[in-house]
Amino acid sequence: MSELAEMMQEAAEAVRIHTHLSADVGIVLGTGLGALAGEVAAETRGPVTQIPHMARATVQSHGTELIAGKLGGKPVFVMDGRLHCYEGHKLADVVFPVRLLKALGCNMVILSNASGGLNPEFDLGDIMVIDDHINLPGLAGVNPLVGPNDDELGPRFPDMSQPYDRGLIKKAQAAAKKQKLKLRQGVYVMVTGPNLETRAEYRMLRNLGADVVGMSTVPEVIAARHLGMKVAAFSIVTDMCMPDMLEEANIEKIIATAAKAEPKLTKLVGALVASI
């Protein structure tokens, strides 16, 4: 057994002391899904700091709990809080929550984030289901899979032709239609942050084909796909990044926009889980 596999097993065993829940779905609560923690009929919950090998998030708007319970009548594990590279965490720490979910038996993971809108057809507060991504840090060699590979966990060269599960995207679209929610679909580009981008950088990212830009999610997606997990991910457009009409970023306004869209995304993800 590799060192990584041992770490995953140790973390899962620590969780199993408190719950024997069997769940196919794991959810990592990034921006826009914080309220979902309150929708879960919790069997048990506890701080991630009590779980071996789990780092702690420093972003104030993110929680630090692992919740085991039911959502929409379906058993789920919910990680309330995510880690970012810009906090100084190693990528292995950033993706470990997803690896723990796999060790607990989850075969699919749902993620969310906040993003800057690059597509001029998008509006502030829109929710986008991600159907592809551009991994700028990864193209520069920053990747959670760099290093020795454990073939029992996943292949050395995992395929990324369809990182976001088409079936889950269709279910999300169907749920949004029932809720009369305008659900965008598009490409997410990841940058490391924490600074926001320049006008020239926004222009370049749009020319590359990105619809939104953000600072998370992609490492977790790569780790999940390496483990054979299905992935669904959603992005809330919290500010518009039009290079020719760019205004100075207002973090308070960005957080407020995410909070306003949060009930819609919470309801959408709840319906998605219920349909699985």
Language-model segments: residues:
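Metabolite-binding pocket within alpha/beta catalytic cores that recognizes anionic/polar moieties
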Residues: M1-M160
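Glycine- and other small-residue-rich loops at beta-strand/loop junctions that grip anionic moieties
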Residues: L4, Y86, F157, S161, ...
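Generic non-transmembrane alpha-helical segments
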Residues: A14, H18, G167, K171-K182, ...
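Polyanion-binding loop/helix "lid" in catalytic or ligand-binding cores
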Residues: E152-Y164, A176, M190-T192, Y202, ...
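Active-site-adjacent substrate-binding region
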Residues: Y164-L227, V231
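Zn-dependent metallopeptidase/amidohydrolase metal-coordination segment
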Residues: M215-K253
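His/Asp/Glu-rich mid-to-C-terminal helical/loop segments that flank catalytic regions of hydrolases
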Residues: C241-I276
